[in-house]
A protein has these predicted regions:
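Charged, alpha-helix-forming regions
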Residues: 206, 448, 456, 465, ...
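Extended recognition patches within non-cytosolic domains
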Residues: 2-25, 30-32, 160-211, 228-232, ...
C-alpha cells in the first residue's frame, strides 16, 4: 500500500502569521471543593510580584472568592460586591471598579515593593498605595483558589485560573507578562522570560505536566548494539514492531500551530513506504505521520498525501546516525538533515485528530516500521529551529522544558522493554514549572483532579452559560461547575439560561449537552425576548427546541411540533450542530431531526444556545472547553481545539474565540471618544485617534450647555443641537473646522470654556462628500461603507421623495434634521420586540422625551432600501426650499449594533448581547413618554463601578454621575437599575459602537 507516494504531494494554503504567545490550559475551580495547597509552608518577603489570569463564573454575591491567600495574611480576592481586594498586611487595596464580567478573562498583577503596592487589571493601574509598610511575614500555609490556612466553602473561587506566576524578590509591572495588541487594542499575554526567585513558582495548569505512558509492542527493545547519546538506543526490527502510547493524546493534535518533531535515526535497512513516527489510525487528512516515501525521501504526510519531503534520498545514510527534524514556523513547514534545511513549503494544514503516538509503524492503514535504531526522539509544541538557519544537532541528551510534549531517551540495559516519556513532570495540577519545584497539591478529599484542566484560556476563550443573560421573565437557573451545569433550583416555574456566545449563521458549529434529569429542553433562540407570554414567537425571531424529557422527545420550531418520539431520557448526551444555518439535533451521536428552517430566518438577531429547566431538572454543557469530569470529553473540533464526548461532524467547530469569524474592520479606526479640558482659547485643536474626523458631537460635561454637532459635509462652522429643534447656526466660536485626525474649536462655553470638561464623540466617514443620484432628489453623501455609516445632505421638494444614502445595504437607523428651519429631529428604525414595532411608519424625536409617533408623512411609510431612504411631505424631513442633513447607519458585525431590548424592571436588569465590548451607547424607550435619550461611553465610565455616568441627548444639563447602574461587558451591556430611562418594563431602541469585537476583548 503506497501510503507515502511522492506524486501525491498536497497543496497548502498560504502561510498564516504567528499567533503570538499561547496559553494552553486553565484550571476550573468551583464551590466548596476547589483549592490547591502549597506542599510546604511559604514565607513571602517584599518585594514580590503575582501575575494570574482569571475568568469568573457564578457571581455569588453572598461570599468572598479568594484567588490566593497565605496564612491568614497576604491575599487576593473578589469581594461580595465584586470589587477586587489585595491585602498585604497591614494595608488593603480595594478597587472602585467592579469586576463581574463572566464572559472573558481578566489579567491581574500585584506589584509589591517595600514601601508601595500597585494593583493592575488588564495592563492598567486600578489601585495603589505608595506609603505603606510590609508586615513582618511568618511562614504558613498558602492556598490557590481558597482561603488559608483552612479554606471554607464560602471563600472558594468560582471560575478559572491560568498562568500563575509568583516572582519572589522582584517587583514587576504588567508589561513583563502582557502587552496591548497593536491592532485590536486588547491586553494579551506574552511569555514571561525572567526568573522566579528561590521561593517563587510558575503554575501553568497545563497538559505539559502529564507524561505519556509508553509500551513496547512486538520486538521493540532498548539495544546496546548501537549508541548515539547514552548507553543504548531504541531498536525497531521492522514489520509492526513499535513503541506506542497507551492512550490517545490531544497533545499531538497540533492544529495549525508550530511544532518540532526530531530524533536520531540509524537505518539498518532502507526501504520505502515505512514509517518512523505515526499519529494516525485512518487516512484522515487531519492526521500526520513521518516515514520513507517511494523515492527514498524522508517525508511528512497526512492521509495518503505527502505535504513535505526531504528532496534528498536517504540511501546515503544507511548504517550511520543521522539527525532528522521537521518543523513548522508560522505556516512554513521545513525538514532538516543533520541541521541543514533540505526543503520547505507553506503549510497551515490543520492536524486535529487525537490518536496514539507511535515510534515505528503498526497503524490500521498497514504502514510498516522503519528497521533500525532511534535515539533522543523529541516532539515539541514550538519551532526549535527557525527560519531555515543551519544548526548543529545536539550530541547530548535533551533536557525537558515547558514546550516538550514527548521526550524518549535510551540509556539503559540491553533488551530492556521499559520506555519512559521524560517530558513534563510527574506532578499534579499544581506542578511548579519553574526551576524550584514549589509544587501545590490537590485537596485530599473531593473531585479536584486532572479532568478540571480546561481548554478555555486567555488566548482561546470558550463559550459558557451567562448568569447576566436571563429570560424575559427574569427567572434564573442555578449556575454550577464553572457555569457549565445549569438548573437544580427547584420551584414550579420554567427557567431559561443563554450562552455568552452567539452561534454564527455561517460556518459549521457543534455543542454537547448531558441531561442530568427532570423536565428539560435544549435549543437555539434568537433572543430572550423572542417568546412572549403564552409562548408566542415574535416576528423575525427563531426558536429551535428539543424537549428531551417531558413528551418523550419532541422537536419544535417556534413552538410548532416538527417531530415526536425522537428519543428522550436522562443521562444521555445530546448535541446540536449548525451547518451554514442548517440546524440538526442529536441524541447519543445519532441525528434525530434536521430542521428545514434555516438560521438565517433570525435576520440580524443573534442566536444563542439555550437550556430550559423545570423544578430540579439539570443540564451539563460542553462547548469544547473539555468538561471531562462528567462528559468524558476527548475529541477535538476540526481545527484541533477543545474536547468533545463524541467526534464532531466533519469540519464542525467549537464555540471559541479562535474559531469566531475574523472581524472585517477595526472599531477604533471608525469611532473614537475624546475627553478634554477647555482652555478658553479662540483656536483649540482637538486630536482624535481616527485617521480623519467627519462627524463630531461635543458636549460639556461639567456644566449646562447645548450639545454641538458638526460634520465635514455641511462644513465645520455649521452647528446643530441635539437638545432642541433650532435651525443650523453658523459661527467660528464653536466647532470651526476639520483637518484629518483633528477638529478645531473656538472659545464658546459649549465647546471650550476655560477649565470645563468635555466629551467629543467622533465618526470617520469619507470626507466632504460627493453627489449621489440614486434617489428622486440628488444628495451629497460622505459614506464609510465598510463601517455602515454615512452623512447625507439634500434639499426638500413638494410631495414624496427618495434620497440616496451611499451605503452598501439598507440603513437600520436614519436620523434627519432640517437645517433651514426650526423643526424636530426625526429618528427612524426597524425594530420588532414583544408587541412593539418601529418600522418607518413612525418616528422618535431626538430632541424630545416622547414615545413613538405614528405618522405617514415623515418617511412616507416606506422602509429604506439598499440605495435610498424615503421621505414624505412632513417639513421635518421634506419641504420645498429647505435643506436637510441625515445620519444613516446599519449594523456591522463586531463594530456597531442597532437593536432593541425589553426592560425587566429589576435591579438585576436586562443583558443586551452585542457581539463586542461597547465604546458608546445611546438608548431610548420606544413606548414610554418622558423617557430620555441616555448617552454613555467607555471614557465617561473607564471602569464599571455600579453607578454609570451619562448625558442626555435631548437635554443640555451636565453629565449625570452615579445615578443609573449599568456595566460595559466584553460581549455587550448589562443594566443594573430600574429607571424608565433604561430598564422599566418597556421596549427600548439602542445604538452602539464597539471598542473591540468580542473575539479580541478582555473581561471588563
Amino acid at each position: 500500500m503506497g501510503v507515502l507516494n511522492e506524486n501525491s504531494i498536497m497543496g497548502s494554503a498560504a502561510a498564516a502569521g504567528g499567533e503570538g504567545y499561547q496559553i494552553e490550559r486553565s484550571l476550573k475551580f468551583y464551590g466548596a471543593i476547589p483549592h490547591l495547597a502549597k506542599a510546604s509552608n511559604f514565607q513571602p518577603t517584599s518585594p514580590y510580584t503575582v501575575s494570574v489570569w482569571v475568568k469568573r463564573a457564578s457571581l455569588d454575591l453572598g461570599r468572598t472568592q479568594f484567588l490566593w491567600r497565605i496564612n491568614s495574611a497576604d491575599c487576593l480576592y473578589f469581594t461580595t460586591s465584586s470589587t477586587l481586594s489585595w491585602e498585604r498586611r497591614p494595608t488593603t487595596l480595594t478597587t472602585t471598579g467592579i469586576y463581574r464580567d463572566t464572559a472573558n478573562w481578566y489579567h491581574i498583577v500585584c506589584k509589591s515593593e517595600s514601601g508601595a503596592m500597585y494593583l493592575y487589571v488588564n495592563g492598567s493601574l486600578v489601585s495603589s498605595n505608595t506609603s505603606t509598610t510590609a508586615n513582618p511575614y511568618t511562614s504558613g500555609a498558602m492556598n490557590i483558589g481558597g482561603n488559608a490556612p483552612t479554606p471554607a466553602s464560602n471563600t472558594c473561587l468560582d471560575g478559572y485560573l491560568a498562568e500563575f506566576h509568583w516572582v519572589q524578590g522582584t517587583a514587576l509591572g504588567p508589561e513583563s507578562f502582557g502587552e496591548f495588541d497593536s491592532k485590536w487594542g486588547h491586553w494579551k499575554p506574552i511569555e514571561y522570560e525572567g526568573g522566579h526567585g528561590s521561593e517563587g513558582f510558575y503554575i501553568p495548569f497545563s497538559g505539559s505536566s502529564t507524561k505519556h505512558s509508553l509500551t513496547a509492542v512486538g520486538s521493540a527493545v532498548h539495544s546496546t548494539a548501537q549508541q548515539k547519546i547514552g548507553a543504548s538506543s531504541i531498536y525497531i526490527p521492522g514489520a509492526a514492531e513499535r513503541v506506542e502510547a497507551s492512550a490517545p493524546s490531544i497533545d499531538f493534535a497540533f492544529g495549525t500551530g508550530d511544532f518540532t518533531i526530531e530524533g536520531w535515526l540509524y537505518w539498518t535497512t532502507v526501504a520505502t513506504d515505512k514509517t518512523w513516527i505515526v499519529n494516525r489510525e485512518s487516512n484522515s487528512s487531519n492526521a500526520w505521520y513521518i516515514g520513507m516515501d517511494t523515492s527514498y525521501y524522508i517525508a511528512m504526510a497526512t492521509g495518503n498525501a505527502v505535504i513535505l519531503n526531504s528532496n534528498t534520498a536517504m540511501n546515503a545514510y544507511h548504517n550511520q546516525w543521522v539527525h532528522i527534524a521537521f518543523t513548522r514556523q508560522s505556516g512554513t513547514l521545513r525538514v532538516y538533515i543533520n541541521g541543514v534545511q533540505k526543503n520547505s513549503a507553506a503549510s497551515t494544514h490543520n492536524f486535529s485528530l487525537t490518536n496514539k503516538i507511535k515510534l515505528g509503524g503498526g497503524d490500521t492503514q498497514g504502514a510498516g516500521s522503519m528497521a533500525g535504531y532511534q535515539d533522543e526522539v523529541r516532539i515539541s509544541k514550538n519551532c526549535r529551529y527557525p527560519d531555515g538557519t543551519t544548526f548543529t544537532p545536539s550530541t547530548t541528551a535533551f533536557a525537558e522544558d515547558s514546550d516538550t510534549i514527548l521526550l524518549v531517551h535510551s540509556d539503559t540495559s540491553n533488551n530492556s522493554t521499559t520506555f519512559v516519556d521524560s517530558s513534563g513532570t510527574t506532578g499534579d495540577l499544581g506542578s511548579d514549572m519553574s526551576a524550584n519545584s514549589n509544587n501545590f497539591n490537590r485537596p485530599s478529599s473531593g473531585s479536584m483532579d486532572s479532568t478540571h484542566i480546561m481548554h478555555d484560556t486567555p488566548t482561546n476563550n470558550f463559550a459558557k452559560f451567562h448568569k447576566a443573560h436571563k429570560d424575559a421573565q427574569n427567572n434564573d437557573n442555578s449556575y454550577l461547575d464553572g457555569d457549565l451545569q445549569l438548573g437544580g433550583g427547584g420551584g414550579t416555574s420554567w427557567r431559561e439560561s443563554f450562552a455568552d456566545f452567539e452561534v454564527p449563521k455561517t460556518g459549521k458549529w457543534y455543542m454537547e449537552f448531558r441531561h442530568l434529569g427532570g423536565y428539560a429542553h435544549i435549543g437555539l433562540m434568537s433572543s430572550p425576548y423572542a417568546v412572549n407570554t403564552g409562548d408566542t414567537i415574535q416576528t423575525g425571531h427563531v426558536w429551535y427546541d428539543y424537549d428531551t424529557q417531558q413528551t418523550g422527545g419532541t422537536i419544535f420550531y417556534n413552538n410548532s411540533n416538527q417531530a415526536s418520539s425522537v428519543g428522550a431520557g436522562s443521562g444521555e448526551v445530546y448535541a446540536i450542530s449548525v451547518n451554514e444555518g442548517v440546524v440538526k439535533m442529536y441524541k447519543s451521536n445519532s441525528v434525530v431531526h434536521t430542521y428545514s428552517q434555516n438560521l438565517s430566518n433570525a435576520g440580524e438577531h443573534p442566536v444563542h444556545p439555550i437550556v430550559q429547566t423545570y423544578g430540579t431538572a439539570e443540564w451539563r454543557v460542553n462547548f469544547g472547553q473539555g468538561d471531562m469530569d462528567a462528559m468524558g470529553a476527548k475529541a477535538p473540533d476540526a481545527n484541533g481545539y477543545g474536547s468533545f464526548y463524541y467526534t464532531p461532524p466533519a469540519d464542525h467547530l467549537a464555540l471559541c474565540s479562535k474559531n469566531l469569524p475574523e472581524p472585517t474592520i477595526v472599531p477604533t479606526k471608525h469611532f473614537d471618544t475624546v475627553l478634554y479640558t477647555g482652555d478658553g482659547g479662540s483656536d483649540r485643536t482637538i486630536t482624535t485617534n481616527l485617521s480623519a474626523v467627519d462627524l463630531v458631537w461635543v458636549k460639556v460635561r461639567s456644566g449646562s450647555e447645548d450639545h454641538r454637532i458638526a460634520d465635514t459635509v455641511r462644513g465645520g462652522n455649521k452647528h446643530l443641537k441635539s437638545n432642541d429643534n433650532s435651525a443650523e447656526s453658523t459661527g467660528t466660536t464653536i466647532i470651526k473646522s476639520f483637518s484629518g485626525a483633528t477638529f478645531n474649536v473656538g472659545s464658546d462655553g459649549s465647546v471650550n470654556g476655560n477649565g470645563s470638561n468635555y466629551v467629543a464623540w467622533n465618526w470617520k466617514m469619507n470626507g466632504s462628500g460627493s453627489s449621489n443620484s440614486n434617489g428622486s432628489t440628488t444628495s451629497t453623501v460622505s459614506a464609510n461603507t465598510s463601517a455602515g455609516q454615512s452623512i447625507v445632505t439634500y434639499s426638500g421638494s413638494s410631495g414624496n421623495d427618495t434620497v440616496g444614502h451611499g451605503l452598501s445595504q439598507a440603513p437600520n437607523l436614519v436620523i434627519v434634521k432640517s437645517r433651514a428651519n426650526a423643526d424636530q429631529w426625526r429618528v427612524g428604525s426597524i425594530q420588532n420586540i414583544a408587541g412593539t414595532t418601529m418600522d418607518f411608519t413612525d418616528y422618535l424625536k431626538l430632541n424630545a422625551t416622547t414615545d413613538l409617533t405614528d405618522e405617514s408623512t415623515t418617511w412616507n411609510d416606506t422602509a429604506p432600501t439598499s440605495t435610498v431612504f424615503s421621505v414624505g411631505s412632513d417639513s421635518a424631513t421634506n419641504h420645498p426650499g429647505y435643506t436637510y442633513v441625515a445620519y444613516c447607519f446599519h449594523s456591522v458585525e463586531g463594530y456597531s449594533k442597532i437593536g432593541s431590548y425589553y426592560g425587566n424592571g429589576s435591579a438585576d436588569g436586562t443583558f443586551i448581547y452585542m457581539g463586542f465590548k461597547p465604546a458608546w451607547i445611546m438608548l431610548k424607550s420606544m413606548d414610554t413618554s418622558y423617557s430620555s435619550w441616555l448617552v454613555t461611553d467607555n471614557k465617561l465610565n473607564p471602569t464599571n463601578d455600579g453607578a454609570g455616568t451619562n448625558l442626555w441627548a435631548e437635554d443640555s444639563s451636565a453629565e449625570n454621575p452615579n445615578s443609573y447602574g449599568y456595566d460595559f461587558l466584553s460581549n455587550g451591556f448589562k443594566l443594573r437599575a430600574t429607571s424608565s430611562n433604561l430598564n422599566n418594563t418597556s421596549k427600548f431602541l439602542y445604538i452602539a459602537f464597539a471598542e473591540q469585537p468580542f473575539k479580541y476583548s478582555n473581561a471588563r
